[in-house]
A protein has these predicted regions:
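Non-transmembrane, aqueous-exposed alpha-helical and coiled segments at domain scale
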Residues: 48-51, 61-63, 70, 75-85, ...
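His/Asp/Glu-rich mid-to-C-terminal helical/loop segments that flank catalytic regions of hydrolases
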Residues: 213-241
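Active-site rim beta-loop-alpha module in soluble metabolic enzymes
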Residues: 127-178
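N-terminal short beta-loop-beta anion/metal-coordinating cradle
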Residues: 1-76, 229-230
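Acidic/polar active-site rim loop that often engages polyanionic ligands
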Residues: 111-128
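A C-terminal functional module that forms or caps the active site or interfaces directly
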Residues: 171-210, 215
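Alpha-helix C-terminal capping segments
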Residues: 57, 83-86, 98-104, 191-199
């Protein structure tokens, strides 16, 4: 860990749980807290990085849900400070764009590894391919497959690619052929986890697909809410395993 053993950007107002969910979107952190935590208390409000904590509805054990903001630099800062505060395992619950035609809107992806096409994971000295914690990723896959009958969407497992740009352009290099989807934070979070010997994993919902001509199809708000709730339930189950 770098030489800042205290939290500078997170100002906790409640006790941190040892297990943490990491959505990027502060609004999704609130929505997940309202669904997954009984009587959630605000954990952090500073910098607009909303976080919530309390007993999980599923098992009564402490759970914290902390937004990371967008992109690898912000995500790395948040996880670093959570480690300083005592987190023991973390799961990113986020969104992604499909890179394969067999993926549909609302499908869930368990990221076994992230291919770092970003600056943050490289700055952290990580290899280009950074693995999720194997045991936590396997727990996510089991939980997702057990729930798929209720959720009625497909579950996929494999590599994703993490990038710095959301609005890509022709100067960006082509994505690796084995990547299922593209997102922005997993490589940085995995890199921080590896450096700190912290189990970190990632479950993603597909929110964008692209046809052969490159036209984007975007998930609607209701379907996104359902997908986020599914991801949250899967992640809590995995953290309880």
């Amino acid at each position: 860990m770098p030489a800042y053993p205290q939290a500078i950007h997170l100002h906790p107002t409640a006790e941190l749980a040892e297990r943490v969910l990491l959505p990027g979107d502060p609004g999704r952190a609130l929505a997940l807290a309202q669904t997954l935590i009984s009587e959630p208390r605000m954990f952090n409000h500073h910098r607009g990085l909303w976080g919530y904590t309390g007993p999980a509805c599923a098992d009564g054990e402490p759970l914290t849900i902390q937004a990371t903001g967008m992109g690898g630099p912000s995500a790395a800062i948040v996880l670093h400070e959570l480690i300083c505060l005592g987190v023991s395992r973390a799961i990113r619950v986020g969104t992604c764009g499909a890179l394969r035609p067999d993926l549909g809107l609302g499908d869930l992806i368990i990221a076994r590894e992230s291919i770092g096409a970003d600056g943050t994971s490289r700055a952290l000295g990580a290899d280009q391919r950074i693995a999720a914690d194997p045991a936590l990723a396997e727990a996510l896959l089991r939980a997702a497959r057990a729930q798929v009958g209720d959720y009625t969407r497909c579950v996929h497992s494999g590599a994703v690619v993490s990038v710095d740009l959301f609005y890509d352009d022709s100067r960006a290099p082509p994505h690796p052929a084995d990547a299922l989807a593209v997102e922005m934070e997993a490589a940085s979070l995995f890199a921080v986890g590896v450096a700190a010997s912290l189990p970190v994993a990632c479950v993603l919902a597909v929110t964008d697909t692209f046809d052969a001509a490159g036209s984007r199809r975007r998930i609607d708000d209701h379907a996104l809410l359902i997908a986020a709730e599914a991801m949250g339930a899967v992640a809590v189950t995995a953290l309880s395993a």
